[in-house]
């Protein structure tokens, strides 16, 4: 066997191995999108007026609790998210066509050749299509994330943002939370459930072997995409 044939076989084997590896190897599943840290925008502090009895300054509440109300305060959001979605679609089409041309006649006599009709024709056609799809998804997320008040809106609502990074064994876990909360919904222990957060964006993701094992390879994604003609 010639060296060229051996090289061609080795190259073909390497190509097939790479394609098969694409079915099982995938890159890291990264959270969407990476949230850059934002420093709280502190409101300008008024300078005290020398010689006056009253001097403007930060709010001092003698009898209030420690609930978040100003920029830079911390707030704990309790994550209690449960979502369930299910969809089903069925499509069926059927079309039939029939065409029949009878034997023409001349002066009342049919046109034949050897006693057989030569100008008559019959055509039939039928098309059927059936499609069916089902999708079901259920998600549950529980935990807590302490966020920072980054802005106080004119109506008193608070814009909050925060994230939590965990490194467990060989994987990284990331939880990001952004949204708007109403001070009246904050409990006395300075916590609020995630269901009370408006414009909420809650992201949970990870990187590592566990995330890779749940990701589909690029070749598998191709055969499950709309690019395939099947």
Swiss-Prot record:
A Pfam family reported for this protein in Swiss-Prot or TrEMBL: FlgH
Any single GO CC term annotated in Swiss-Prot or TrEMBL for this entry: cell outer membrane
Lipid-attached positions, S-diacylglycerol cysteine: 23
Bilayer disposition of the protein: Lipid-anchor
UniProt family annotation: Belongs to the FlgH family.
Molecular function terms, GO-annotated: cytoskeletal motor activity
Keyword Signal: yes
Main location: membrane
Organism name: Stenotrophomonas maltophilia (strain K279a)
Record's protein name: Flagellar L-ring protein
Signal peptide boundaries: 1-22
rRNA processing found in the keyword field: no
Lipidation (N-palmitoyl cysteine): 23
Subcellular location: Cell outer membrane; Bacterial flagellum basal body
Record's function text: Assembles around the rod to form the L-ring and probably protects the motor/basal body from shearing forces during rotation.
The encoding gene: flgH
Superkingdom, taxonomy of origin: Bacteria
GO terms of biological process kind: bacterial-type flagellum-dependent cell motility
Keywords of the record: Bacterial flagellum, Cell outer membrane, Lipoprotein, Membrane, Palmitate, Signal
SUBUNIT field: The basal body constitutes a major portion of the flagellar organelle and consists of four rings (L,P,S, and M) mounted on a central rod.
